[in-house]
Amino acid sequence: MAEVSEEIRNLAARHQELQRQAEALRQEMGMIQTSISSCDQTIVTINELKAASEAGKPAETMVPVGFGSYVYAEVKNPDRIIVNLGAEFSAEETAEEAIETLNRRKEQLTKILEQMNASLTRLTQGMQTLEAEAAKLQPGQA
């Protein structure tokens, strides 16, 4: 009986560890999803600014000036975009190039998200396996 109790404790400890890993993975997945949404929104904004400029309208936007405050500004050249390349490097690109860069980044993030989702599935299956093992060990559950 003591062996069964010890085995159940071991299964519970392994289950808790898998739960912690799954929660950490879910948080990372949320951050990746936020980045994908940010790419989408940036592409929409670039297209809107470009369309306004091509229609002869002023391309207006709000520019953050700090502490949740913004000013309205007119974009003088909406076809030139400064794109973050990572590692604190940026490059000036045309609007089309910037959209291509953002779409590539989005594809990479989507692949990472798919891999993370597969990992989450494996963790969930591992937890279910541990739960089934624990149920077999408990008296009156067989």
Curated annotation (Swiss-Prot):
Molecular function in Gene Ontology: unfolded protein binding
Keyword Transcription regulation: no
Keywords noted in UniProt: Chaperone, Cytoplasm
PANTHER family with a match to the protein in the record: PREFOLDIN SUBUNIT 5 (PTHR12674), PREFOLDIN SUBUNIT ALPHA 2 (PTHR12674:SF4)
Disulfide bonds: none
GO terms for cellular component: cytoplasm; prefoldin complex
The UniProt record lists the keyword Chaperone: yes
Subcellular locations according to the entry: Cytoplasm
Protein name: Prefoldin subunit alpha
